[in-house]
């Protein structure tokens, strides 16, 4: 699938796959940002995209950043709709007790393109019964 990217900032790094078979490309920060403990920050990538209709871009955490630094994407996955043309930003949250320093050029998240299915919604008086019923939120044990 083809994705058209616009560099909005000279420090913007064009995302690329790190390994054959990867599902996501890495997004990079364009400037340093300090994220205080247990706080969030919007990290700029310096990129805008022309996303094909029928798809969306999802912003997902980088596992190493989450495991080693306790820093992750807050609204994961973040959704970038096909009709959005602004700068791609990444909301990071620092779950640690120390300040996390985002450095310019640092890989901060992954971006994945996925197909979108639109809903045809029908309002009904009742939904069908299943063996699970209304059981949820730990109903099968923890």
From Swiss-Prot:
<dbReference type="Pfam" id="PF00692">
    <property type="entry name" value="dUTPase"/>
</dbReference>
<dbReference type="GO" id="GO:0046081">
    <property type="term" value="P:dUTP catabolic process"/>
</dbReference>
<feature type="binding site">
    <location>
        <position position="75"/>
    </location>
    <ligand>
        <name>substrate</name>
    </ligand>
</feature>
<keyword id="KW-0460">Magnesium</keyword>
<comment type="similarity">
    <text>Belongs to the dUTPase family.</text>
</comment>
<dbReference type="InterPro" id="IPR033704">
    <property type="entry name" value="dUTPase_trimeric"/>
</dbReference>
<dbReference type="InterPro" id="IPR008181">
    <property type="entry name" value="dUTPase"/>
</dbReference>
<comment type="function">
    <text>This enzyme is involved in nucleotide metabolism: it produces dUMP, the immediate precursor of thymidine nucleotides and it decreases the intracellular concentration of dUTP so that uracil cannot be incorporated into DNA.</text>
</comment>
<protein>
    <recommendedName>
        <fullName>Deoxyuridine 5'-triphosphate nucleotidohydrolase</fullName>
        <ecNumber>3.6.1.23</ecNumber>
    </recommendedName>
</protein>
<keyword id="KW-0546">Nucleotide metabolism</keyword>
<comment type="pathway">
    <text>Pyrimidine metabolism; dUMP biosynthesis; dUMP from dCTP (dUTP route): step 2/2.</text>
</comment>
<keyword id="KW-0479">Metal-binding</keyword>
<dbReference type="InterPro" id="IPR036157">
    <property type="entry name" value="dUTPase-like_sf"/>
</dbReference>
<dbReference type="GO" id="GO:0000287">
    <property type="term" value="F:magnesium ion binding"/>
</dbReference>
<dbReference type="GO" id="GO:0006226">
    <property type="term" value="P:dUMP biosynthetic process"/>
</dbReference>
<feature type="binding site">
    <location>
        <begin position="79"/>
        <end position="81"/>
    </location>
    <ligand>
        <name>substrate</name>
    </ligand>
</feature>
<dbReference type="InterPro" id="IPR029054">
    <property type="entry name" value="dUTPase-like"/>
</dbReference>
<feature type="binding site">
    <location>
        <begin position="62"/>
        <end position="64"/>
    </location>
    <ligand>
        <name>substrate</name>
    </ligand>
</feature>
<dbReference type="GO" id="GO:0004170">
    <property type="term" value="F:dUTP diphosphatase activity"/>
</dbReference>
<keyword id="KW-0378">Hydrolase</keyword>
């Amino acid at each position: 699938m083809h994705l058209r990217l616009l560099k909005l900032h000279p420090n913007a790094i064009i995302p690329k796959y790190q390994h054959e078979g990867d599902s996501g490309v890495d997004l990079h920060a364009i400037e340093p940002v300090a994220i205080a403990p247990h706080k969030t920050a919007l990290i700029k990538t310096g990129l805008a995209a022309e996303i094909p209709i029928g798809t969306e871009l999802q912003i997902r955490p980088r596992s190493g950043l989450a495991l080693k630094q306790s820093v992750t994407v807050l609204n994961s996955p973040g959704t970038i709709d096909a009709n959005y043309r602004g700068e791609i930003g990444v909301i990071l949250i620092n779950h640690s007790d120390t300040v996390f320093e985002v450095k310019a050029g640092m890989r901060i998240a992954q971006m994945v393109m996925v197909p979108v299915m639109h809903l045809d919604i029908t309002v009904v008086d009742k939904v069908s019964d299943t063996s699970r019923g209304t059981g949820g939120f730990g109903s099968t044990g923890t």
